[in-house]
């Protein structure tokens, strides 16, 4: 037996056909929430994603091709996306690993300058199930984002969309 609260116990079931129609502002029919994830991948550990499967299999360290894929995003991809989002004045949320503020501060500075909303995304790109102290990781992430922006981050998106049964309560 476990004391953990399951996700299905946090939310009462509600079929969409039994709910009142959701009225959106200005008669809109759809909401689009633009979230840009920016992450720090540790080159001394197996990479969180494999775009290129190593020829010999396994998880080589360093895994330069997959680490470089992430690094391209921070050096090029972020800036190209930001240019388009700025051009069309798209309100954006930056889901960032807290360590972005120290390892890639230029990215965080530009998002802050653009008045983007900041959302915690772990301190580094490591599954919440693998983080040694989840409470500390979340607190460290919140603290560094608040120190950088002057505001608490709004919301949480676990790295790789992961969370534990305790994440919501932390």
Regions found by a protein language model. Give the residues of each.
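Catalytic alpha-helical scaffold of carbohydrate-active enzymes acting on polysaccharides/glycoconjugates
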Residues: 2-155, 160-170
């Amino acid at each position: 037996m476990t004391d953990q609260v399951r996700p299905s116990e946090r939310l009462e079931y509600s079929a969409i056909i039994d709910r009142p129609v959701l009225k959106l502002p200005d008669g809109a029919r759809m909401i689009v929430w633009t979230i840009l994830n920016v992450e720090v991948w540790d080159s001394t550990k197996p990479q969180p994603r494999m775009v290129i499967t190593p020829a010999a299999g396994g998880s080589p360290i360093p895994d330069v091709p997959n680490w470089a894929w992430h690094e391209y995003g921070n050096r090029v991809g972020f800036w190209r996306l930001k240019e388009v989002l700025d051009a069309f004045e798209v309100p954006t949320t930056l889901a960032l690993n807290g360590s972005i503020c120290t390892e890639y501060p230029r990215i965080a500075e530009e998002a802050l300058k653009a008045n983007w909303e900041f959302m915690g995304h772990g301190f580094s790109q490591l599954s919440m199930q693998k983080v040694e102290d989840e409470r500390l990781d979340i607190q460290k992430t919140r603290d560094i984002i608040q120190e950088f922006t002057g505001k608490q981050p709004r919301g949480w998106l676990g790295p790789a969309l992961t969370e534990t049964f305790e994440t919501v309560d932390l």
